[in-house]
């Protein structure tokens, strides 16, 4: 369940809809296993919200033996609302505050339809089409 208060006015003004956890798990259960077992695979959620999908991806990667820092460093997200971005970052970090620099670069507040996907020093003029993510959710 999401950590942001979802009053009727906010939902109406932002059109945000959050994916229930059972549906997130069902979608990920149908995702090829390599996205959870290969530490070099990258994942991006262009409408990450509070991190439902990305958090579950991180959990599955760790359960498959990928070190936390490596798993975290290949997960990317974009959301248009700052409070969602903050919640996503917190969800992914847990108690690992010393890795905050990773989520500050990889989880960004922007309009995913207009964002140039500049993560961690990549070319700011690349478009989403030009970026090479191994798996996109959202």
Pin down the residues of each PLM region.
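SAM-dependent methyltransferase catalytic region
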Residues: 1-138
């Amino acid at each position: 369940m999401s950590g942001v208060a979802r009053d009727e006015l906010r939902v109406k003004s932002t059109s945000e809809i959050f994916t229930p956890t059972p549906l997130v798990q069902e979608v990920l259960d149908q995702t090829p296993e390599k996205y959870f077992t290969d530490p070099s695979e990258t994942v991006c959620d262009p409408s990450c919200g509070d991190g439902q999908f990305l958090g579950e991806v991180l959990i599955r990667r760790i359960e498959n033996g990928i070190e936390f820092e490596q798993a975290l460093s290949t997960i990317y997200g974009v959301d248009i609302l700052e409070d969602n971005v903050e919640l996503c970052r917190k969800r992914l970090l847990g108690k690992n505050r010393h890795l905050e620099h990773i989520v500050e670069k990889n989880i960004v507040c922007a309009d995913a339809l207009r964002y140039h996907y500049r993560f961690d020093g990549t070319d700011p003029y690349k478009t989403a089409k030009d970026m090479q993510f191994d798996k996109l959710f959202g």
